[in-house]
Amino acid sequence: MSLLRSLRVFLVARTGSYPAGSLLRQSPQPRHTFYAGPRLSASASSKELLMKLRRKTGYSFVNCKKALETCGGDLKQAEIWLHKEAQKEGWSKAAKLQGRKTKEGLIGLLQEGNTTVLVEVNCETDFVSRNLKFQLLVQQVALGTMMHCQTLKDQPSAYSKGFLNSSELSGLPAGPDREGSLKDQLALAIGKLGENMILKRAAWVKVPSGFYVGSYVHGAMQSPSLHKLVLGKYGALVICETSEQKTNLEDVGRRLGQHVVGMAPLSVGSLDDEPGGEAETKMLSQPYLLDPSITLGQYVQPQGVSVVDFVRFECGEGEEAAETE
C-alpha cells in the first residue's frame, strides 16, 4: 500500500471522516420506485378492506381490488365505483338481451299495516328465478312499491286499489338503502345474472278500519332477508269487509286467496247469483275450491265477512297469452 493511501486510512480510523475529494466518502445513490397508478398494498388492513367490500357488494375479488386501487383504498367510494361500473355493464347487457322471452320469474307479496302489495318480476329461466340475486331484486321491487303506496293519501271510509305497469314500476325510487330507481336495480341484476328481465307489474291495496286483506301465494317461500315478503308463482289478494274482529280472519283470508288462485274468477259476483253459465267466472257462485259441494258464497256467509274485491297474479301469464295469438 502506498504511503499516501496508508495515511488516508489512518486518518479515517482516527477521526471518522474522509478527506475532501476522497472517493471513499461517496455513498451509493438512493434507489426510487415509481408506480404507473395507485396500488393496493398487501397489508392486513388492505386485505380486510377487500374482504369487507366483497361481502358487502357480492362482486368478484378482482373487481373489488380494482375498485379499491382506483379509489385509493376508500371503501365507500370503491362501493360507488363498483355499482356504477356494474350498472354500465348491466345496461349494455340489457340492450343486447332485449326481446328475449321472459316467461319465468316470481310473484312477491308484502304486507305492512293496512297496505298490501303484489309484484311480478320476470326472467328467462326457472334456474335464475331461484337465484338469491334475483330474489333480492323482487324484494327491492316490493319495497319500492310499498314506499310508493305509503306516500298516497288514505281513504277514510273506503279501500283503495291501484296498479303499476312496467314503465311506472321502473321509475319508482329503489328504496331507503339503494340509490337510483328500480330500473337501475334491474340493470344491476341483468349484469350479474346475464338474462333478460322485466319489472312486469304491481298491484297495491290500502284498507281502512272495518276492512282487511286476505292473501295467498302458491309455492310460497320466504324472502332471504325480509321475513314479511313471500315469494311464489301465483299470488292473490282478497279484500273483505267485516263488522267484527274475529280470531280466524287470517285463516279465512288465506282460504279465499287459495280459491282465487285455483279457480281464477273474473269478478266477485253476488250471493244471489245462480251457479252455471256466466256465473262460473263469478267468485261467489263458483264451487268452493276446498269443498266443491258448496259455493264459495255459502262458505263465506257464516264467517261474518263480505268479499268486495280481489287481485290475482299468475307469473308469466301475459307472455303465454302472447305466444298463443
UniProtKB/Swiss-Prot annotation:
PROSITE patterns: EF_TS_1 (PS01126), EF_TS_2 (PS01127). Gene3D superfamilies: DNA helicase RuvA subunit, C-terminal domain, Elongation factor Ts, dimerisation domain. One of its GO terms (cellular component) is mitochondrion. The keyword NADP does not apply. Keywords: Cardiomyopathy, Disease variant, Elongation factor, Mitochondrion, Phosphoprotein, Primary mitochondrial disease, Protein biosynthesis, Transit peptide. The modification Phosphothreonine is found at T324. It is found in: Mitochondrion. It comes from the Eukaryota. The modification Phosphoserine is found at S270. Belongs to the EF-Ts family. It is linked to Combined oxidative phosphorylation deficiency 3: A mitochondrial disease resulting in severe metabolic acidosis with encephalomyopathy or with hypertrophic cardiomyopathy. Patients show a severe defect in mitochondrial translation leading to a failure to assemble adequate amounts of three of the oxidative phosphorylation complexes. This is Elongation factor Ts, mitochondrial.
